[in-house]
Regions:
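The conserved beta1-alpha1 loop
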Residues: 114-116, 275
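Active-site-proximal cap/loop segments of hydrolase catalytic domains
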Residues: 136, 143-348
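Peripheral, non-catalytic segments that deliver or gate enzyme domains
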Residues: 1-106, 118-137, 177-181
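Hydrophobic beta-strand anchors of alpha/beta hydrolase catalytic cores
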Residues: 109-113, 141, 303
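Conserved residues at the C-terminal ends of beta-strands
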Residues: 37, 114, 219
Length: 348
């Protein structure tokens, strides 16, 4: 939460007990106050009221509004900031979760998550992908903010333009290896990755670049930049920024070289493709055509459609099964337990 003085242009950041601020409202009284929802990677949402006359305001829980009470005595995974200095001395920020019953003498499979769209992953317990829950299922969970993510300055975000994953993939691969080197409790042979939308594209593209991962999940991913450019709710509009000045007819190399579909023969990692049948952002064909290619090649791939779902799965019942599907896929390939996957009615 920041304050901006419109007269001087000066700004400063308030020091709050939360890492995420959600849905705030300001008072209009003589003493400036704010009421906001906030949370961290280890605490659930709570409502706070804060006096903004100080840069370190006292934040008081507001009344009896506390989602955290629903957790009771449930132990949550720990959440720790972590960053990696690339070989070119640039920094890749991130954080990681460890199970509540973590034992450093044991080996753990690891999941790597990166942005959906180019929106950075925030340190919050109630995230769209339940990273803390996954950690407590026996994983180390590493969340990275690779090049192209917004929130780290204009230059950092602009690295996404006309690269379509190249620099971001370098960030993810280098950072994942560096994390494993620094944390010997990670089982290097049991590392999975996942992302959605542009993050789904990254999942697919990464498998054409490395054999680092033992399992991968792409939700609503883009497999063919050319077909996405001309379809979907905003493919062309997005492309006007993401590949500014580059079109299939004047820069075909970008569209082919960076698309997983045209490099499908390089993919050997077991890959799960998830897609809502009513996705207006990324058409379902983006998953269908990669699934077809990998099946022709005889590679381990599964494709599951969520009936009637748009770009994000919002129906409660579908969302529960969607989450279970993700968990079951990783349990099958990273924990050696296929019972959950089979129990959901899916075939190999």
């Amino acid at each position: 939460l920041w304050r901006l003085d419109p007269r001087t242009g000066k700004r400063f950041r308030f020091e709050l007990p939360t890492t995420v601020v959600q849905r705030f409202t300001l008072s209009e009284g003589r003493v400036p106050r704010v009421v906001f929802f906030g949370q961290t990677g280890t605490t659930s949402r709570n409502a706070y009221v804060a006096d903004l006359t100080s840069s370190r305001p006292k934040c008081t829980p507001f009344g009896e509004v506390s989602f955290a009470k629903a957790l009771g005595d449930v132990q949550v995974a720990s959440c720790t900031p972590w960053s990696y200095r690339r070989s070119d001395r640039d920094t890749v920020p991130g954080f990681y979760f460890l199970p509540a019953d973590f034992d450093a003498t044991k080996k753990y499979p690891m999941l790597v998550y990166y942005y959906g769209g180019c929106v950075p992953t925030t340190r919050e317990l109630e995230f769209h992908y339940p990273l803390s829950v996954l950690a407590n299922m026996g994983y180390v969970v590493l969340a990275l903010e690779p090049s192209g993510a917004i929130g780290y300055g204009e230059e950092f975000a602009a690295r996404h333009i006309n690269t379509w994953g190249k620099r971001s993939a370098d960030d993810i691969i280098e950072a994942t290896k560096a994390f494993m080197d620094a944390h010997p409790y990670v089982d290097r042979k049991k590392v999975g990755c996942m992302g959605a939308s542009y993050g789904g594209f990254m999942t697919e593209y990464l498998q054409t670049r490395t054999d680092l991962f033992a399992a991968a999940i792409s939700h609503a991913g883009i497999s063919n930049i050319a077909s996405y450019w001309g379809g979907g709710y905003w493919g062309h509009t997005y492309g006007e920024t993401a590949q500014y000045g580059s079109y299939p007819w004047n820069n075909p190399e970008l569209y082919v070289k960076q698309s997983a579909l045209f490099n499908a023969d390089k993919i050997h990692t077991p890959l799960l493709l998830l897609h809502g049948t009513a996705d207006t952002n990324v058409p379902t064909n983006e998953s269908q055509q990669l699934f077809t290619a990998l099946r022709i090649l005889g590679r381990p791939v599964s494709y599951i459609q969520i009936e009637g779902a748009n770009h994000v799965v919002t129906d409660y019942g579908q969302r529960v099964k969607w989450q279970q599907t993700i968990m079951a896929w990783f349990a099958k390939y990273l924990q050696g337990d296929a019972a959950w996957w089979k129990g959901l009615g899916f075939k190999d």
